[in-house]
């Protein structure tokens, strides 16, 4: 039930950034075990995360938006480190400015004045960085709790964890980490309720759809949104995720 640790959160991120349909190789030699874990995580979502997310929608929208802004701001140092490692000077400058402005004027990231100044948010992680360095992703994996991934992306998550400033606090422990990622994950899941339900209802094979969306999204993220793949069919609910 953590941000990007719960498979539905990873799907929500994939849907919000997915750029196209394209010819994407499945690269899924462990499909049988992956499908089993997918079913397990679907049940965890149905009986744990989804009910909590529905209740979270009763929290006023401005409060939920501030929660989202806060967690986005916490992720900025990780994005900045990867911007630098990818030699993306302009994007690194944008990330640094956003973090500085939102951490001060935005009151520890609760608000996003940087966006009103034209400094748009983007996300980077070490999985993307390794891809730009030419490291192969390895086979598709659907892991317990963490969700859609690959050996490259999973190892990248460990590196990103090291650059997360929260992990270096003296009083940081497992209980605080679980609380942080649980709230973050519930917030994302609440935003994606309608979208994911629509995707599941319209999919002949929900597992294959999730796999395809995830792989396409990672391809788009690695290319910083510049791809040569065709547009996906429009889904109105996807537009609602773009601001989160």
Question: In which residue ranges do the predicted regions lie?
Answer:
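Bacterial N-terminal signal peptides that target proteins for export
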Residues: 1-7
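Post-signal peptide N-terminal segment of mature Sec-exported envelope proteins
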Residues: 25-50, 54, 72
């Amino acid at each position: 039930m953590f941000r990007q640790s719960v498979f539905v959160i990873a799907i929500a991120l994939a849907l919000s950034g997915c750029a196209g349909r394209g010819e994407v190789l499945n690269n899924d030699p462990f499909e049988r075990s992956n499908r089993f874990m997918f079913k397990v995580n679907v049940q965890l979502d149905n009986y744990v995360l989804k009910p909590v997310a529905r209740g979270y929608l009763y929290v006023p929208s401005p409060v939920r938006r501030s929660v989202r802004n806060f967690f986005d701001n916490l992720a900025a140092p990780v994005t900045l480190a990867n911007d630098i490692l990818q030699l993306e000077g302009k994007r690194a400058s944008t990330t640094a400015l956003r973090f500085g402005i939102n951490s001060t004027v935005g009151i520890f990231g609760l608000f996003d004045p940087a966006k009103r100044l034209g400094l748009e948010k983007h996300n980077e992680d070490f999985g993307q960085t390794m891809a730009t360095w030419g490291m192969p992703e390895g086979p598709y994996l659907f892991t317990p709790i963490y969700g859609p991934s690959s050996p490259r992306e999973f190892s990248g998550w460990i590196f990103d964890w090291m650059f997360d400033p929260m992990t270096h606090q003296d009083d940081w422990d497992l209980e605080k980490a679980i609380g942080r990622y649980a709230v973050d994950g519930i917030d994302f899941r609440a935003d994606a309720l309608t979208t994911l339900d629509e995707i599941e209802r319209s999919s002949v094979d929900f597992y294959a759809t999730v796999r395809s969306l995830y792989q396409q999204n990672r391809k788009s993220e690695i290319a910083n949104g510049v791809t040569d793949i065709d547009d996906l069919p429009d889904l109105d609910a996807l537009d609602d995720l773009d601001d989160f």
